[in-house]
Amino acid sequence: MNSAVKYPELKIKLESYDSTLLDLTIKKIVEVVKGVNIKIKGPLPLPTKKEVITIIRSPHVDKASREQFEKNTHKRLMILVDVNQGGIDSLKKIKIPVGVTLRFSK
């Protein structure tokens, strides 16, 4: 494709259950983006989604005995400004670890 094609703004939304893994992925993306000379806004922390699950410990009676588990989904938003096709190609080459979800939007 033509490398002169530009997108005025490209939003990357990252989600993960592990915040350290999410931060390492963000560092990789920032290094690649700075190497291609693309302006970057962020990473902006978004609200963490907290999901609490309560189960009864006993299989029979004793409903007062319960156990709670929680699952936190950490989210970040990065906005890339004036992205060309070469920048998008370099973003596609990044190895994203298992457990991190990326979503791109204009």
Swiss-Prot record:
GO terms for molecular function: structural constituent of ribosome; tRNA binding. It comes from the Bacteria. Keywords: Ribonucleoprotein, Ribosomal protein. GO terms for biological process: translation. Coiled coil: none annotated. Transmembrane segments: none annotated. InterPro entries: Ribosomal_uS10, Ribosomal_uS10_CS, Ribosomal_uS10_dom, Ribosomal_uS10_dom_sf. It holds the Pfam family Ribosomal_S10. GO terms for cellular component: small ribosomal subunit. Belongs to the universal ribosomal protein uS10 family. Involved in the binding of tRNA to the ribosomes. Part of the 30S ribosomal subunit. PANTHER family: 30S RIBOSOMAL PROTEIN S10 FAMILY MEMBER. NCBIfam families: PRK00596.1, rpsJ_bact. This is Small ribosomal subunit protein uS10. It comes from Mycoplasma genitalium (strain ATCC 33530 / DSM 19775 / NCTC 10195 / G37). The gene is rpsJ.
